[in-house]
């Protein structure tokens, strides 16, 4: 593979994460305006965004098999057509049913693109370099999560219709579409070059089960935590502005943490540092919940920094449980994480209704403790050390 081809594929991976991050995180910014547009209460409007998450979940799950049937380049180009149709649907229609359908299509497109992006990184890079590259790729999710809410705020403050926010997000896919030209993608399944030696199907091993549980609990814990921090902080007498600042502090330090760990991880055994980070994150979250309001910002900043490498390290370790990275395995771990996203309000909503926001935060803390236990047990069964060959590039 030529160096320019590798750079193009790497940028497609970066942008695939930015696309999903923009779509998922911008929701909170535009929900009120969309509810007004359809003359609906915000609470019932939030349910229609489940179509976005459902689209992401279904496409990540199905793409484990589709990757071997439909070439990656074809998928990305077809995704561009779907993206244009979905954004056009948002702009031209005043129907809630069509809005929900367009959200579902946007979810499908971003899920397919993100699973391809993850697979490309696991395919092109090996050993410790794979972990640091995946981490840097994942930082684009957070970066888009910082940039696009600002874009949305700028447009909405000037009374520009909410659907132009989605048109701006569509520009990310335009860049992906342009990058597919003159770019060779790895061939999979029936399109892969035939080799003399038959491919031996590797068993995944029990380590994948531990990592999948860790992925689900981590995402459910993280989103359950960050979704209820503003309500919890307001309950302690903080202003809405200060409560919102806690959330943006978390994502900012999360992004800086990703950049730092994309360098640091190269020098450590991935399973060991993951166990340390998971334990540290559980302790820091507990300290945040028990802290006085004046100390909360410091705890959430350190929590964001030290927890930033956990999810990507889980995916990387998953990809290293087999000698040859398997798209089905990587997508399985990703799917478990996405299920965590889907369950966020299903799990935390009733807890908050019954016992208040602090109970939701303590539940999230318990989930982080489960992640630590899974990572610790993984140390006894992981196969990544026998497959971990130093990368040549």
UniProtKB/Swiss-Prot annotation:
Primary subcellular site in the record, as a coarse category: membrane
SUPFAM superfamilies: MFS general substrate transporter (SSF103473)
MF GO annotations: transmembrane transporter activity
Pfam families: MFS_1 (PF07690)
Keywords for the protein's UniProt record, in alphabetical order: Cell inner membrane, Cell membrane, Membrane, Transmembrane, Transmembrane helix
Superkingdom classification of source: Bacteria
Bilayer topology annotation: Multi-pass membrane protein
Location relative to the cell: Cell inner membrane
Transmembrane regions: 11-31, 51-71, 78-98, 101-121, 134-154, 162-182, 206-226, 245-265, 273-293, 297-317, 332-352, 361-381
Keyword Nucleotide-binding: no
InterPro entries: MFS (IPR011701), MFS_dom (IPR020846), MFS_trans_sf (IPR036259), MFS_TsgA (IPR023528), MFS_TsgA-like (IPR050375)
GO cellular component: plasma membrane
Protein family according to the UniProt entry: Belongs to the major facilitator superfamily. TsgA family.
Name of this chain's protein: Protein TsgA homolog
Organism: Citrobacter koseri (strain ATCC BAA-895 / CDC 4225-83 / SGSC4696)
Upper lineage: Bacteria, Pseudomonadati, Pseudomonadota, Gammaproteobacteria, Enterobacterales
Gene designation: tsgA
């Amino acid at each position: 593979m030529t160096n320019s081809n590798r750079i193009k594929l790497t940028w497609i991976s970066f942008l695939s994460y930015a696309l999903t991050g923009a779509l998922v995180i911008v929701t909170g910014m535009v929900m009120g305006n969309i509810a007004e547009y359809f003359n609906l209460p915000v609470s019932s409007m939030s349910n229609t965004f489940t179509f976005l998450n459902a689209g992401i979940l279904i496409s990540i799950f199905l793409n484990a098999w589709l990757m071997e049937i439909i070439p990656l380049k074809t998928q990305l180009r077809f995704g561009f057509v779907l993206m244009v149709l979905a954004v056009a649907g948002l702009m031209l229609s005043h129907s809630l049913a069509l809005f929900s359908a367009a959200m579902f299509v946007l979810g499908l497109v971003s899920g397919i693109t993100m699973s391809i992006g993850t697979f490309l990184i696991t395919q092109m890079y090996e050993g410790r370099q794979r972990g640091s590259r995946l981490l840097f790729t994942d930082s684009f999710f957070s970066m888009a999560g910082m940039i696009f809410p600002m874009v949305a705020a700028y447009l909405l403050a000037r009374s520009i219709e909410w659907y132009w926010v989605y048109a701006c997000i569509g520009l990310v896919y335009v860049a992906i579409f342009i990058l597919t030209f003159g770019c060779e993608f790895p061939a999979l399944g029936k399109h892969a070059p035939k080799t003399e030696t038959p491919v031996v199907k590797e068993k995944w091993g029990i380590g994948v089960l531990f990592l999948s549980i860790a992925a689900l609990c981590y995402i459910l814990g993280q989103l359950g935590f960050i979704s209820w921090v503003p309500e919890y902080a307001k309950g302690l007498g903080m202003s809405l502005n200060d409560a919102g600042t806690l959330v943006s502090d978390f994502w900012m330090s999360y992004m800086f943490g990703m950049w730092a760990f994309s360098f640091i991880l190269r020098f450590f055994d991935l399973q060991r540092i993951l166990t340390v980070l998971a334990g540290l994150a559980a302790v820091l979250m507990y300290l945040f919940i028990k802290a006085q309001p004046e100390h909360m910002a410091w705890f959430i900043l350190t929590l964001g920094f030290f927890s930033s490498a956990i999810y990507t390290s889980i995916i990387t370790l998953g990809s290293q449980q087999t000698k040859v990275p398997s798209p089905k395995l990587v997508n399985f771990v990703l799917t478990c994480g996405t299920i965590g996203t889907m369950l966020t309000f299903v799990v935390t909503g009733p807890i908050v209704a019954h016992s208040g926001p602090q109970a939701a935060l303590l539940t999230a803390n318990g989930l982080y403790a489960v992640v630590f236990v899974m990572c610790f047990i993984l140390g006894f069964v992981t196969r990544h050390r026998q497959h971990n060959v130093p990368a040549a590039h």
